[in-house]
Amino acid sequence: MPMKVKKSSFAGDGLKKKVCPSWESDKNQVSQLNKSIMHAKVYQITKRRVDKENYLNENTLTQGDSSDYDYCSEISEEERAESIDTLVNQILPKGMFTLVGSDELVFNGGNYEWIHKWVDAIHKKSDEVTAENVTHWIGAAYQLQKVINNPLGTDSHFYLSESTTQTFAEPSAELMRMVCKLRKGERLYIGRIIDYHF
């Protein structure tokens, strides 16, 4: 499966090749990656169980030009179960949550250790930013931004609202800010999960 990279909004107009020697190779890399069909999930995760009329749906989020989503679509119950398994066992930090039933996540702790690892990762990435590479299209500055906004390293987004008035979902940093305030034994609830293309 090809690596998924979010489209960059940095155009770099007016920069000369002499200033950014890797510009052309960066552009070619992005061009090749964007040719792949890229899908991910939006998970509705809340502190209280949400009524079904407040479930996220394929029309909740702003889609198309100037948004993170080309289009959104519903998923089957089978795909929902697979997506929840992926969330618990691959996306969230290992052992931090236990799935109870089909839609409850019980917090097991571990946020203190996790947040220190996140800070270490931010420091490591910031040390890699230099005057020579800060202007690279997908360079060290971009990688630093990714680890700050998306510490779980997932293309999935998270809809943390308990109503459907919010028209956007958020990267994993916002989910983990919510998680880091939980006490052991507290629960989160999984509402609707939708697929999106980007």
Which residues does each predicted region cover?
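Serine/proline-rich low-complexity intrinsically disordered segments, especially terminal tails, linkers
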Residues: 10-11, 24-27, 33, 78, ...
